[in-house]
């Protein structure tokens, strides 16, 4: 009896066409990443072994991933990992998936301080710990705290903390914004945050990938600025003199967040950091000394 043979090349071609029919943005790349995950090989391996037949067990693990991807689940949530700042983080469908935009925030802080600076960092709305752990990885004498209201996110953050062996320099706590710090008298050199900032009215234009991520990690109220208002008011209480704040913002929110910081009257040196496309995606400031 004839048994159909699926090679690496053939399955990738089929998957690309299938994802194209679903109008997915990166059909070829998605298929390659999912197959690499199943085979536990890098993507280069796929091209150097194009004619390699796949085992039935490999096909059985690959097909459900393709189906779930077509339903709108992100590749990262399906593979359980996401690369960020040259590091590989654990993720799942209960956390915000790290995006390249956020690297602009991390790179700004890394360029502001030296490796030997023993700074203390607070990461508000830490999610899977991506920002804080990246900073601690590249600033080997820094320490930090990550706060988040989501227990599911903190579970993944702790997993990443252990993977990078940063237990001695980082801590994660469940907290509704600054509530944890109300009982802990501590000041920080830096407060970073990538808070929820999508406007509620923009929900209808979001891709299925994004809508499958946790609601509480995405939306920042009617105008998207709800969390920035609280950050602007509260950060001054927990920063050392001339301490730094650095917030990721939506593509059109930089001026609005700047205005919020100005209205508080406690910040100086308010400025922007742009992404590779020249869009201001980070707002930074210093608290008055």
Predicted regions and their residues:
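Mobile active-site "lid"/loop adjacent to the S-adenosyl-L-methionine
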Residues: 197-226
């Amino acid at each position: 009896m004839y048994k159909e043979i699926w090679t690496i090349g053939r399955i990738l071609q089929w998957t690309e066409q299938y994802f194209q029919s679903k109008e997915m943005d990166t059909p070829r790349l998605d298929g390659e990443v999912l197959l690499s995950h199943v085979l536990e090989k890098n993507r280069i391996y796929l091209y150097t072994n194009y004619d390699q037949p796949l085992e039935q067990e490999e096909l059985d693990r690959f097909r459900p991933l393709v189906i779930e991807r077509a339903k709108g689940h992100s590749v990262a949530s399906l593979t359980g990992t996401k690369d960020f700042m040259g590091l590989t983080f654990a993720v799942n469908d209960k956390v915000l998936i790290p995006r390249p935009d956020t690297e602009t925030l991390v790179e700004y802080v890394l360029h502001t301080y030296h490796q030997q600076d023993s700074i203390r960092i607070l990461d508000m709305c830490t999610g899977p710990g991506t920002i804080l752990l990246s900073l601690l990885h590249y600033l080997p004498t820094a320490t930090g705290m990550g706060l988040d209201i989501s227990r599911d996110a903190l579970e993944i953050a702790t997993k990443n903390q252990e993977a990078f062996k940063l237990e001695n320099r980082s801590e994660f706590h469940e907290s509704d914004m600054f509530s944890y710090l109300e009982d802990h008298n501590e000041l920080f050199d830096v407060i970073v945050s990538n808070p929820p900032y999508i406007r509620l009215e923009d929900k209808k234009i979001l891709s299925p990938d994004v809508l499958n991520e946790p609601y509480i990690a995405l939306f920042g109220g009617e105008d998207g600025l709800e969390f920035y208002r609280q950050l602007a008011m509260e950060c001054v209480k927990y920063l050392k003199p001339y301490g730094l704040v650095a917030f990721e913002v939506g593509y059109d929110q930089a001026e609005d967040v700047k205005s919020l910081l100005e209205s508080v009257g406690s910040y100086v040196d308010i400025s922007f950091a742009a992404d590779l496309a020249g869009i201001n995606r980070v707002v930074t400031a210093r608290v008055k000394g």
